[in-house]
Every structure is written in structure tokens, then in C-alpha cells.
Swiss-Prot record:
It comes from Vibrio parahaemolyticus serotype O3:K6 (strain RIMD 2210633). One of its GO terms (molecular function) is vitamin transmembrane transporter activity. Keywords: Cell inner membrane, Cell membrane, Membrane, Transmembrane, Transmembrane helix, Transport. The complex is composed of two ATP-binding proteins (BtuD), two transmembrane proteins (BtuC) and a solute-binding protein (BtuF). This is Vitamin B12 import system permease protein BtuC. Coiled coil: none annotated. It is found in: Cell inner membrane. The lineage of its organism: Bacteria, Pseudomonadati, Pseudomonadota, Gammaproteobacteria, Vibrionales. It is a multi-pass membrane protein. GO terms for cellular component: plasma membrane. It comes from the Bacteria. One of its GO terms (biological process) is cobalamin transport. Part of the ABC transporter complex BtuCDF involved in vitamin B12 import. Involved in the translocation of the substrate across the membrane. Belongs to the binding-protein-dependent transport system permease family. FecCD subfamily. The chain crosses the membrane at residues 20-42, 62-84, 91-113, 118-140, 147-169, 189-208, 240-262, 277-299, 306-325.
Length: 331
């Protein structure tokens, strides 16, 4: 078998994986719309109440789960290449921390409970603010990628400390709201909130198309520059795109951990490291994972709903450990 045939077979394998994951996402989405306290059968006509339940409650929730999962997974895959660290995720640069901090400050600063739109704008503003702080420090001090990672960790610790102070001084009602949001939830998703997905979608598509530059960055900054990549400009474009996606994700569903870390790493262990295929596959896999997690969050308890962040951690951690053990045994 010649080299050209090997490349062709590899491309077909990636394309087959994309088709399989797309089918899985469609099946999970169908199940997501059907199940709940009221079962909606696709084989019979729906009443007015069932149509309203489907269109106004379940469909917005499905879109939120899929968009958040895709955004976090692609952001994680990009950061892991950009920083050269498999432990990198959207929270590692302090971007998620900035979004959560802004929402907490809005919750306690305003005399009345903020509207969902105010929460969304606050989360996006917080993530962008922390990104601009990061960019300003890095440009002033001419930071390398490794030092950029350390600055992001420091910003994340700072935001976490302030949120902890908010916990300490909050009353019972505010504390419950804050706790539930920090654990991640899309139970209140509505079409009104999905104006933010109009911002997420083009950024997500653009990021999924950056596979070839990221493949060159994996060779190192010097080699990437020799291959025609403006590393400095590309780095900040990617960070700004990630900040928008993460801010919108936090605004829609709170802090949902583990997706950006586990999904790209699992796909690399299973299928390889070509980012031109890995990024769109991460988007589909991340969307499918969060849709599946939300199905479990709604069905596991009869009288209550589990936080989505708890579900993603419960699903992702055992799979991640199993894949690491399998990879080690195969060596």
C-alpha cells in the first residue's frame, strides 16, 4: 500500500467517524425531545399543550445543551494545542472565571434580581474583560505561551477567591441560586436567551475551520512561523474567539466542567491528532455528550433535576480514567 493510499484511508476513517457521531447526535436529540414527565411520541399527533411543551421548553433546552457542549469541546481542543498542554481547558486562562465573577457581581450589586439578558451580557463582558487583561499583560511583558498559561491560572484563582467571598456574605436565597448556577443548569433555557447563540454560531464555525493552522502550531512556534503562520496574530484571534464562546456558554448554562478537557483528549486517544478533523468532531462529540448528560439530569430523579455540571463530571471522569488505562496498556 503506497503513501497516498494510506492518507486516503486515514481521511475516510475520519469522515466515517464524523458521520457516526452525527447520527448519534441526531438520535440523542430525538430522545431528548421525547422523554420527560410527559412522553412525546413521534408517531402520533401532538395536542396544543404538547406542541407548546416541545417548541417552548424542550427544543430551546436541546439547542442550549448542544451549543454549550460544542463550544466548550472546541474551545478545549484549541487551547490544548495553543498552549501545548493536554490539561488546558477554557477555565485555565481565567476566561470561565471572569464570566462567573461578572455574573456573581451582577447578582449581588443590583437591587432586584437581574433578567436573563443582563446575566448573559455580564458573563460575556466578564470573559472579554479577563481576556483583554490577559492580552495586555502578555503584550507588555512579552510572555511566552507557558507564562501565558501561568497568568491565566492566576486570574482563575483570583476570580475563584472573589466568588468564595460572595458565598460567605450571601443570604440563603442568593446562596441557593448561586450554588445551583455554579453547578451548571439549562433548565431555564428559552428562545429569548438564544439571542446569544447567534453570536456563538459564527465564532464556533470559524474556530472549527482553523485546523490546518493549529496542525502547524503543534510543530512548535518556530516551525509554524516558517510554514507561514503568523503565530502572534493567530494566538490572539484564537483566544478572543474562545473567550466569546466560553462567555456565552457560561451565560446560557453556568459553569459546566470537564467537557473542554475530556472530549478532545478522548478523541485524540481514540482517533488521532489531525485538527482539521478533530475540531468538528469535538464539536459534535461535545454536543452529543451534553445532550446525553441533560437527558440523565432530567430522568434520574423523579421529583427533582440534577445539575448538569454534576452529570458531565460523573460521565466524563470514569471514561477519561478508562481511556488512560487503555492507552497505557496498549503501549
Amino acid at each position: 500500500m503506497d503513501f497516498q493510499q494510506l492518507i486516503l484511508n486515514k481521511e475516510r476513517r475520519w469522515q466515517r467517524n464524523l458521520v457516526i457521531m452525527s447520527v448519534v447526535l441526531v438520535l440523542l436529540s430525538t430522545i431528548h425531545l421525547m422523554v420527560g414527565e410527559v412522553f412525546l411520541s413521534p408517531f402520533q399527533s401532538l395536542s396544543v399543550f404538547e406542541q407548546k411543551l416541545l417548541l417552548d421548553l424542550r427544543l430551546p433546552r436541546l439547542v442550549a445543551a448542544a451549543m454549550i457542549g460544542a463550544a466548550l469541546a472546541v474551545s478545549g481542543a484549541t487551547l490544548q494545542v495553543l498552549l501545548g498542554n493536554v490539561l488546558a481547558e477554557p477555565g485555565v486562562l481565567g476566561i470561565s472565571g471572569g464570566a462567573s465573577l461578572a455574573m456573581v457581581l451582577v447578582m449581588f450589586a443590583l437591587p432586584v434580581l437581574p433578567t436573563p439578558m443582563i446575566f448573559m451580557l455580564a458573563a460575556i463582558a466578564g470573559s472579554m474583560l479577563f481576556t483583554l487583561i490577559l492580552v495586555g499583560i502578555a503584550r507588555a511583558m512579552h510572555l511566552t505561551t507557558a507564562r501565558l498559561l501561568l497568568v491565566g491560572v492566576a486570574l482563575g484563582i483570583l476570580s475563584s477567591a472573589i466568588v468564595t467571598w460572595a458565598f460567605y456574605f450571601s443570604d440563603d436565597l442568593s446562596l441557593r441560586q448561586l450554588m445551583y448556577w455554579l453547578m451548571g443548569s439549562i433548565g431555564g433555557a428559552s428562545w429569548y436567551q438564544h439571542t446569544v447563540t447567534l453570536v456563538m454560531l459564527p465564532v464556533l464555525v470559524w474556530l472549527c475551520c482553523q485546523g490546518k493552522p493549529l496542525d502547524k502550531l503543534m510543530l512548535g512556534e518556530i516551525h509554524a512561523t516558517q510554514l507561514g503562520v503568523d503565530v502572534h496574530q493567530m494566538r490572539w484571534k484564537l483566544i478572543l474567539a474562545i473567550s466569546v464562546l466560553v462567555g456565552c456558554s457560561v451565560a446560557l448554562g453556568g459553569i459546566i466542567s470537564f467537557v473542554g478537557l475530556v472530549v478532545p483528549h478522548l478523541l485524540r486517544l481514540a482517533f488521532g491528532t489531525e485538527n482539521r478533523y478533530l475540531l468538528p468532531l469535538s464539536a459534535i462529540f461535545g454536543a452529543a455528550l451534553l445532550v446525553f448528560a441533560d437527558i440523565g439530569a432530567r430522568l434520574l430523579l423523579d421529583s427533582a433535576e440534577l445539575p448538569l455540571g454534576v452529570m458531565t463530571t460523573s460521565i466524563g471522569a470514569p471514561i477519561f480514567i478508562w481511556m488512560l488505562v487503555k492507552s497505557h496498556d496498549a503501549r
